[in-house]
């Protein structure tokens, strides 16, 4: 409630926060590492100058999520690769809920979220939270938004449990993603079934 009041009461246009986690990438049989970006980002970001192009008062920095306890629990209790992958995917649902709540608060206050870190699994709760928040604020008639993904991968794989490779599919299937555009999509990185689904939508 205190964070929500701070966001609503701020004159800032943008709200910055971090999601230093890599559980979605690991749940997609990928290599972790997206959890390490937040601190180096801050070291550079805090050295930016406030000027006519970007006034520091336009940005409210509220901190970052800490999902280290989920990572530790999985690392210390999962037995074997299959159980570990399933646990990562289950943990992504928890991350989704927390990120969606925060983004909904930010957008309902008519502000723009700026997010650093995490995998593309975070695209789903960002889209969902933004659509709900902007709809609540009266900015959009339906809780649906359009999205441009600048990536070599479409991240539109089947709904087989949440991970970094299917965020946009979940967002569309759940009705929060209206139009989806991928810029930089690499032919060698898209399964045929995902390609057909994107072309037909």
Where do the PLM segments sit?
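Conserved alpha-helical scaffold segments that buttress catalytic/binding sites
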Residues: 1-201
């Amino acid at each position: 409630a205190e964070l929500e009041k701070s966001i609503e009461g701020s004159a800032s246009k943008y709200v910055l926060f971090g999601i230093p986690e890599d559980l979605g990438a690991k749940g997609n049989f990928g290599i972790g590492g997206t959890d390490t970006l937040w601190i180096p980002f801050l070291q550079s970001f805090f050295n930016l100058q406030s000027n006519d192009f970007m006034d520091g008062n336009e940005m409210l920095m509220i901190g970052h999520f800490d999902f280290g306890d989920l990572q530790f629990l999985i690392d210390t209790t999962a037995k074997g690769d299959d159980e570990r992958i399933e646990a990562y995917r289950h943990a992504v649902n928890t991350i989704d809920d927390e990120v969606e709540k925060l983004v909904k608060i930010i957008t309902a206050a008519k502000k723009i979220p700026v997010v650093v870190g995490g995998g593309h699994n975070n695209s789903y709760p960002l889209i969902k939270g933004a659509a709900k928040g902007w709809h609540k604020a009266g900015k959009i008639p339906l809780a649906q938004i359009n999205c441009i993904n600048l990536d070599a991968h479409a991240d539109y794989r089947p709904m087989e449990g949440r991970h970094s490779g299917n965020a946009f599919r979940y967002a569309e299937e759940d009705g929060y993603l209206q139009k989806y555009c991928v810029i930089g999509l690499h032919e060698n990185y898209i399964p045929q079934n995902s390609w057909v689904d994107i072309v037909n939508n």
